[in-house]
């Protein structure tokens, strides 16, 4: 069988097939089932504060105001406590040390970035994804895609993260 292993920025995994940060990566049990099924890595559903649960989780896309042609997912960051996610992340890395686990992060202040980075790395995250692209969560608080659209803010937060992180940082 062919060797499909990858090394991306020092993050190793048995193959290039990874789950994105989304509802299927919202917990350790789901990620372990994915690894059992052959996935090589996972980006944990975005961790941060506060936990906000929205309803409904879908918004309709209409065509000319006449008919629905699709749906938007308006789910925000994880709706599970940070401590629970970090404990499960630790267990996933313990059970699957050769699989990639990336912590997707979204917080506001420099102090919050420093704390969540250390906690994610202590839980075994192989790398950090800075969630600067999410179009439907926390924009009103200067997070998600509002950061990704402002180069100076993006540069400032990325510099904080790089100063604190010991693992690769993905922006």
What are these model-derived regions, one by one?
Residues 3-13, 18-23, 27-171:
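Active-site entrance/lid segments in N-terminal catalytic domains of soluble metabolic enzymes
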């Amino acid at each position: 069988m062919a060797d499909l292993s990858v090394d991306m920025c020092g993050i190793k995994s048995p193959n290039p097939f990874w789950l994105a940060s989304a509802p299927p990566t919202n917990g350790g049990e789901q990620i372990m089932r994915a690894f059992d099924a052959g996935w090589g890595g996972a980006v944990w559903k975005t961790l941060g504060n506060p936990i906000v649960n929205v309803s409904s989780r879908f918004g309709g896309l209409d065509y000319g105001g006449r008919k629905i042609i699709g749906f938007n997912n308006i789910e925000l960051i994880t709706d599970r406590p940070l401590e629970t996610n970090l404990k499960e992340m630790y267990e996933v890395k313990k059970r699957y040390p050769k699989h990639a686990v990336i912590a997707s992060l979204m917080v506001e202040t420099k102090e919050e970035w420093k704390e969540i980075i250390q906690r994610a790395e202590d839980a075994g995250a192989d790398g950090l994804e800075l969630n600067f692209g999410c179009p439907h969560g926390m924009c009103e608080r200067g997070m998600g895609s509002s950061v990704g659209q402002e180069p100076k803010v993006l540069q400032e937060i990325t510099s904080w993260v790089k100063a604190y992180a010991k693992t690769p940082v993905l922006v």
